From Swiss-Prot:
The gene is sucC. It catalyses: succinate + ATP + CoA = succinyl-CoA + ADP + phosphate; GTP + succinate + CoA = succinyl-CoA + GDP + phosphate. This is Succinate--CoA ligase [ADP-forming] subunit beta. It is an enzyme of class 6 (ligase). Succinyl-CoA synthetase functions in the citric acid cycle (TCA), coupling the hydrolysis of succinyl-CoA to the synthesis of either ATP or GTP and thus represents the only step of substrate-level phosphorylation in the TCA. The beta subunit provides nucleotide specificity of the enzyme and binds the substrate succinate, while the binding sites for coenzyme A and phosphate are found in the alpha subunit. Pfam families: ATP-grasp_2 (PF08442), Ligase_CoA (PF00549). Keywords: ATP-binding, Ligase, Magnesium, Metal-binding, Nucleotide-binding, Tricarboxylic acid cycle.
Length: 387
């Protein structure tokens, strides 16, 4: 689950980080009032969306008066902001953040952390190249990115943060401020179950103060049950409508741009199914994992979700029966096909627990379903069904 910038800054500030002061505004008048409240000569109005690249897309503007703040907010709120990280529709702008102007600054740094699956540790990354696309820095000049793996038994130690500060070229009070920032960020990361966080840029002001000018936080969705206050910050308007609907039925769904709908149980098998569709010349329209303990109701909802996509011209159902029984899946498929007006070819491959029984149920149903004897056969048939 992603947080908006203003939410991320509020959370980081509660852990002792110095952040760029700001006020969220949901309409132009609130934006004008926010400018006056901040009391500076300048302010920065930022569209609050769950996407990067806002500046290049026109979602970040410097304003010099409350009237300008009102006008910028009016031009952004109620629109969709399209950036390089969004789809063609963009993300809806329901609010803007009006932030104090911290510039000029002497330096812009980068600080971020992720759960590194290869090392199975929280890994911090820092760089002198802040304020730019960190992916480009990692690709073009990887030597400019410092990495620190944190031992989960002892946590991030002050000496590790100091070492990073030295390598970033910080000096004097800046070192202590950076150590406080990094330690606070780690504490927030662990206590709030972050999956990812970024401060880009982490600015060094002319007075030596270190300030978080931006903030990006992604929370581990599997841990949200123990963070009700953070869950209350969820902005469903920023989420893909189909993916949101899928999550309500405990389905793992990711929309893609192909025309072959996929319904599979198990994430690994789902990825293998998409790969083999591609191998046979097709294009998957989605990733959809109904889970190892799929119920009949969940399968029906999954089928509806796939067919809601107008781009889907054929469907491949690939089920390996382990915990889930193939005969139950077969009954759910029949019920779903009858409930939804299916006008596209449906290829079904069943293996494992009660597969023969499931195949017989489908064969006796009288529906025009296409049976497959293996994964390769299923991929071949679904691609050929497109004509």
């Amino acid at each position: 689950m992603n947080l908006h910038e203003y939410q991320a800054k509020d959370l980081l500030e509660s852990y002792g980080l110095k952040v760029q002061k700001g006020i969220v505004a949901h309409n132009p008048n609130e934006a004008a009032q926010a400018f006056d409240q901040l009391g500076g000569k300048f302010a920065v109005v930022k569209a609050q969306v769950h996407a990067g690249g806002r500046g290049k897309a026109g979602g970040v503007k410097v304003v010099k008066s409350s009237q300008e703040a009102r006008e910028v907010a009016e031009s952004l709120i109620g629109t969709n902001l399209v950036t390089f990280q969004t789809d063609a529709e963009g993300q809806p702008v329901n609010s803007v953040g009006v932030f104090e102007d911290v510039y000029p600054v002497t330096r812009e740094l980068y600080l971020g952390a992720v759960v590194d699956r290869s090392s199975r540790k929280v890994t911090f990354m820092a760089s002198t190249e802040g304020g730019v696309d960190i992916e480009e820095v990692a690709h073009n000049t990887p030597e400019k990115i410092l990495k620190v793996e944190v031992d989960p038994l002892v946590g991030l130690q002050p000496f590790q943060a100091r070492e990073v500060a030295f390598k970033l070229g910080l000096e004097g009070k800046q070192i202590n401020d950076f150590v406080k920032t990094m330690l606070g960020a780690y504490k927030a990361f662990v206590e709030c179950d972050f999956a990812l966080f970024e401060i880009n840029p982490l600015a060094v002001r002319e007075n030596g103060e270190i300030v978080c000018v931006d903030g990006k936080i992604n929370l581990d969705s599997n841990a949200l049950y123990r963070h009700p206050k953070l869950l209350a910050l969820r902005d469903k308007s920023q989420e893909n409508a189909k993916e949101l609907k899928a999550s309500e039925h405990e389905l793992n769904y990711v929309a893609l741009e192909g025309n072959i709908g996929c319904m599979v149980n198990g994430a690994g098998l789902a990825m293998a199914t998409m790969d083999i569709i591609q191998l046979y010349g097709g294009k998957p329209a989605n990733f959809l994992d109904v889970g190892g303990g799929a119920t009949k109701e969940r399968v029906i909802e999954a089928f509806k979700l796939i067919l809601d996509d107008e781009n889907v011209k054929a469907v491949l159902i690939n089920i390996f029966g382990g915990i889930v029984r193939c005969d139950m899946i077969a009954e759910a498929i029949i019920e779903a096909v009858k409930e939804v007006n299916v006008t596209v070819p449906v290829v079904v491959r069943l293996e494992g627990n009660n597969a023969e029984k499931g195949a017989k149920i489908l064969a006796d149903s009288g529906l025009t379903l296409i049976p497959a004897d293996g994964l390769a056969d299923a991929a071949d048939k679904v691609v050929k069904s497109l004509g």
